[in-house]
Amino acid sequence: DGKVGEKEKVEEVREYVKSIKGFKSIHYTFSKNNKGLADSIIGGVSQVINQYGKVIVLEDDLVLMPNFLNFLNQGLDYYENNQKVMSVCGHSCKVKVPADYPYDAYFFTRSSSWGWATWKDRWDLVDWKLNDWDSVVANRKAFIKSQGSDVFKMLRDCKLGKNHSWA
């Protein structure tokens, strides 16, 4: 699922993926056609989450701490019944955390595509078509304060068909 003219590189990555060891089991799905970023991620996450009820998603170029998967799995278990928590993330924007903050986690209004996990019931709430866009625009200042101006611009571009991001 790469760019036109990169068939050899795509095959190299597929062979590498097939060689990965260290997990109880590995399932991979290779696409015959380039679906684009948004459709690939949304479709892949939906496939896994529909089968298992939850999912952990990683970017392909991350370097993880040894306890990363344990952290996300604990978060999935701990917050599973808290409908206010949409996802558990292993990365966030830079925030000021007090030096004496005693916990391993904190709440934040933004999500991150760089290592995260969620549950099927939360995933099913996402409005991929941005049907509520008029409400977002009407409450623009509050949205930007909560999510950031970059997210507002990205969603606006998605709504206008200029961007096909999923995050």
Identify what each model region corresponds to:
Residues 1-57, 62-167:
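An acidic/histidine-cluster motif and surrounding catalytic segment
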